[in-house]
Structure formats: C-alpha cells, structure tokens
A protein has these predicted regions:
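Conserved nucleotide-sugar phosphate-binding/catalytic loop shared by glycosyltransferases and other
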Residues: 58-99
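Active-site and donor-binding regions of nucleotide-sugar-utilizing enzymes
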Residues: 34-37, 42-49, 76, 88-135
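Non-catalytic N-terminal targeting/anchoring module and adjacent flexible stem/linker
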Residues: 1-2
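N-terminal subdomain of nucleotide-sugar transferases
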Residues: 7-66
Length: 135
C-alpha cells in the first residue's frame, strides 16, 4: 500500500470509529493516545496513522531509542513529515536483556505519569514486546 493510500485509509478508519462510537471522547474532547516506536519499520508503517491521529487525539509519541540514530530514524521523521517524538526513553542497555528491561521500566513509568486512554504499538520488535509487558 502506498503512503498516500495509507494516509487515506488511516483517516477514513478514524472517521468511521468516531461515527460508530467505537471511540468515546473525553479530556476536552480528545482521548490521550500514547504511541511508542523504536525502529525504522515501526516509524514507516505508523507514519500516516501518527499524522492523522494528531487531528483526533491528544497524541504523545515516544521513541524507545532501540535503534535511534539520525541516519536510521531521524531522517524518516523529516521525510515522512512527522513531528519529533515528544519523549525519548533512552533505553539502550549493555545487552538485549538490559535494553528490554529498560523499555519495560521506562514505558511503564511513562504510562503511569501520562495516564493515556490508549497505547499503540505496531510490530514484532523488542520495543513492542517490552511495551506490552509494561502495560
């Protein structure tokens, strides 16, 4: 699916969810949505969704830092016209276990602090697996 088609699909899906009351608004008319990414594939796949959800939700975008490097991720934010993440969790540890533990710990603390109405992750990465553990 092209990025243009993804963009249209994301907007139409959100409109339908609102129309059929799958989403009930609060917080001044907007649900608080925490979106957590950690890798390039997650950023690319979620770009259209992130941009469209900002219209309908109070979105907080967090980056785990799993693969953070301007050449690996930062350039995609610019090219996909995404705002920089509001939160960098800086979770990289000395090994895989430490990194995953840091993602669980820091994403849990972020969820406790922000109290989002929903959390969105997409993918099969260590970031997604660990965030699910924190939820």
């Amino acid at each position: 699916m092209s990025l243009k088609n993804q963009d249209v699909y994301a907007e139409e899906r959100i409109k339908l969810m609102v129309e059929y009351n799958e989403i009930s608004f609060k917080n001044n008319g907007k649900l608080k949505l925490l979106i957590i990414v950690g890798t390039r594939p997650e950023i690319i796949r979620l770009a259209a969704v992130i941009n469209k959800t900002r219209k309908y939700f109070d979105v907080i975008l967090a980056h785990t830092g799993q693969n953070y490097d301007y050449n690996l991720n930062g350039i995609f934010f610019k090219d996909l016209k995404l705002a920089d993440p509001e939160v960098y969790l800086d979770t990289v540890g000395d090994d895989l276990g430490a990194t995953m533990g840091n993602i669980i710990d820091k994403s849990y603390k972020l969820m406790v602090e922000l109290k989002p109405d929903a959390v969105l992750v997409l993918g099969d990465t260590n970031s997604c697996l660990s965030v699910i553990g924190a939820k």
